Amino acid sequence: MDSRVHRDVGSNTHTGMKRLTVIAGPCVVENRDTTMRIADTLLLICDRLEINLLFKASYRKANRSRMDAFTGIGDMTALEILSEVHDRFAADVITDIHEAEEAARAAMFVQALQIPAFLCRQTDLLIAAAKTDLPINIKKGQFMSAAAMENAVGKIRSVTGRPVIITERGNSFGYNDVVVDMRNISLLSGICDGVLVDVTHTNGGAYRHSFALAAASIAAGADGIFLETHPDPGKALSDGKNMIPLYEVEGLLTQLKQIKEVVG
């Protein structure tokens, strides 16, 4: 096992989030080698910068627009790769689930679960995730107000006292566009244990916008960011246009840490 220090998920709750927190990784597990390369790079960066990292990758994409879109390499194969990331690097890993039946199985391989934005109101899914007793990240739906997310958090807290993070994912602004309302950061902070901002799915398919979104989010009081990254986004099998190239992540996180230190 890698000698890096394992950090317990949830030790960095909103009431004591002094370190920048990042959920980062590829959109989906494409293969073992790419996943390990991304995890190794991110962990080296975050250890060096003293940033809390949750490594994220979907083991299956269930919400693709096109029938011929890539959905995964097989559930068990992908979950075993995510488990290997944890074992090899002593890293906390998070993956998303789309149906209640997935929760217990996924929880055997990862240290936290994520609820997709489109499903953030699904009671059965939220309760199933809560019953695993793992920390949970809920991505706020593009159709949801910050205040409405209190109900989603309440469903989870009716079952478990484990940390609940909300990731701001923007709000619909006409057809095929979203905008991030920075007021939501302070509004959400009162109802959960930490607020992150998704800076890749809100960039309109132009990853350069992610840098300004990330800086503004931390300056506005977010505890951290959610981002997806890939060594070669042009060859990524899912969401390549939104992804930040892996070689640019360190510069971004260095800047965000500096902002975080100023705003506290």
Identify the residue ranges that each predicted region occupies.
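Catalytic alpha/beta core domains of metabolic enzymes, predominantly
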Residues: 133, 137-231
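Short beta-strand segments at enzyme active-site cores
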Residues: 51-58, 93-97, 197, 224-229
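Catalytic beta/alpha-barrel core
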Residues: 74, 91-99, 111-124, 135-146, ...
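Alpha-helix-loop-beta-strand connector modules within alpha/beta enzyme cores
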Residues: 42, 70-93, 129, 133, ...
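Active-site-adjacent loop and "lid" segments of alpha/beta metabolic enzymes
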Residues: 67-76, 114-119, 176-182, 200-220, ...
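Short, well-ordered coil/turn segments that N-cap beta-strands
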Residues: 18-20, 49-53, 89-93, 109-111, ...
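A short alpha/beta connector and helix-capping loop motif
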Residues: 35-39, 103, 107-115, 123-132, ...
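Conserved N-terminal beta1-alpha1 strand-loop-helix module at the mouth
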Residues: 8-81
